[in-house]
Amino acid sequence: METIRADEISNIIRERIEQYTREVKIVNTGTVLQVGDGIARIYGLDEVMAGELVEFEEGTIGIALNLESNNVGVVLMGDGLLIQEGSSVKATGRIAQIPVSEAYLGRVINALAKPIDGRGEISSSDSRLIESPAPGIILRRSVYEPLQTGLIAIDSMIPIGRGQRELIIGDRQTGKTAVATDTILNQQGQNVICVYVAIGQKASSVAQVVSTLQERGAMEYTIIVAETADSPATLQYLAPYTGAALAEYFMYRKQHTSIIYDDPSKQAQAYRQMSLLLRRPPGREAYPGDVFYLHSRLLERAAKLSSALGEGSMTALPIVETQSGDVSAYIPTNVISITDGQIFLSADLFNAGIRPAINVGISVSRVGSAAQIKAMKQVAGKLKLELAQFAELEAFAQFASDLDKATQNQLARGQRLRELLKQSQSAPLTVDEQIMTVYTGTNGYLDSLEIAQVRKFLVELRTYVKTNKPQFQEIISSTKTFTPEAEVLLKEAIQEQMERFLLQDQV
């Protein structure tokens, strides 16, 4: 029979005491007072931060937005149907953040960066705060590189630069999203990563954008963040910030990015819903007082970074829908005042068959020719002026019966210039194709053609130059200038093609 040795027992007890570490966890908790309509009011949570994530007993996550004297107003990231009054809530100590990585390219995700395309999880090691401060003045440099959209009307007269914020504004069904998707398609081979954020859109519209991008191989460099019309208001409010965080990840890694918000007015409506339910005082059009800050802190994150930070860029293209052309409503005026210019799409032009329906007269880019290559500046200088004069003359010509020859010629030229700006959807043009198109129009080579023949002639001219004068494209891409040599080549091509075209026409 073994004897029990007291010293061994005491040694074991001493070892166990030494190994014992007592973990004390202090958790900031509260109790649900009221829940409903995507909002919960919590008693307690004394040390919660503004914007901190809180976790409910059944797993729902919320964001603390209203810090009041006797309760905390929390917006829920989900339906919150299982949350009960009296259940406990704990503060997580974290601000909303999302995982980020290269693996997100080609994927469709929601506002919490979770995949919704049914293609499995996305691996990532890094994370970024959904809301992070915009780069300061010293960290930026002025915009000087063009972001080509592939649309002649924009690239020649309302140029967009890398790091700029350009608003696309117009009534519903005027082709706003088409301008944005064409811009994405045109970034193929340009080393630009695109992020498309769909806020409060129909799921069918988002699916259509995804399928267009997939067909053209553009999803390889695109991320789509989608919160459709049936998503909770909180997630619609967060979606643009999620998109911005993903674009920033690439921007700070010395890459060029372009982000499209479609559309911030839906985000403002979601924010208005949340604010009214939180009993914040309503202002103009029932929006809360800080709705300007909602959009300014989002769009200020677009930047062209300085050389010290690697010269990455983030170009923002917000799309805002107007009601029957009223750009003086609250959200449109706010976004116009934040952005560096706007592209107006007109329902009248769209219905008249001018597509893209860009109203060149009232569209503007505040970066201007700094965002154009020299060749485009040389060629497109007088295009906008001629179109503006034509628009004025056209209005006048409706009342005048007998016009002199010079006025008739100017009207004829203007009609042909307007014709050359027309483009099919998903058919962006390269810079050299745009330069030859604009040059042909502004130098009067189209004046002898019927208006109906203009587009056919231009399509054939582009093909002819590509096959018979490849040096033209080489000169433009290597020197970025419209040299005398390039002009001679183009003149030859136009004359040769014009002869062929007129011969075909006679046959």
UniProtKB/Swiss-Prot annotation:
The keyword Methyltransferase does not apply. Gene3D superfamilies: 2.40.30.20, ATP synthase alpha/beta chain, C-terminal domain, P-loop containing nucleotide triphosphate hydrolases. It is an enzyme of class 7 (translocase). F-type ATPases have 2 components, CF(1) - the catalytic core - and CF(0) - the membrane proton channel. CF(1) has five subunits: alpha(3), beta(3), gamma(1), delta(1), epsilon(1). CF(0) has four main subunits: a, b, b' and c. GO terms for cellular component: chloroplast thylakoid membrane; proton-transporting ATP synthase complex. It is a peripheral membrane protein. Produces ATP from ADP in the presence of a proton gradient across the membrane. The alpha chain is a regulatory subunit. It comes from Cucumis sativus (Cucumber). NCBIfam families: atpA, PRK13343.1. Its EC number is 7.1.2.2. Belongs to the ATPase alpha/beta chains family. It is found in: Plastid, Chloroplast thylakoid membrane. It comes from the Eukaryota. CDD domains: ATP-synt_F1_alpha_C, ATP-synt_F1_alpha_N, F1-ATPase_alpha_CD. Signal peptide: none annotated. InterPro entries: ATP_synth_asu-like_sf (IPR023366), ATP_synth_asu_C (IPR000793), ATP_synth_asu_C_sf (IPR038376), ATP_synth_F1_a_nt-bd_dom (IPR033732), ATP_synth_F1_asu (IPR005294), ATPase_a/bsu_AS (IPR020003), ATPase_F1/V1/A1_a/bsu_N (IPR004100), ATPase_F1/V1/A1_a/bsu_N_sf (IPR036121). ATP binds at residues 170-177. The record marks 363 as: Required for activity. GO terms for molecular function: ATP binding; proton-transporting ATP synthase activity, rotational mechanism. It catalyses: ATP + H2O + 4 H(+)(in) = ADP + phosphate + 5 H(+)(out). This is ATP synthase subunit alpha, chloroplastic. Keywords: ATP synthesis, ATP-binding, CF(1), Chloroplast, Hydrogen ion transport, Ion transport, Membrane, Nucleotide-binding, Plastid, Thylakoid, Translocase, Transport.
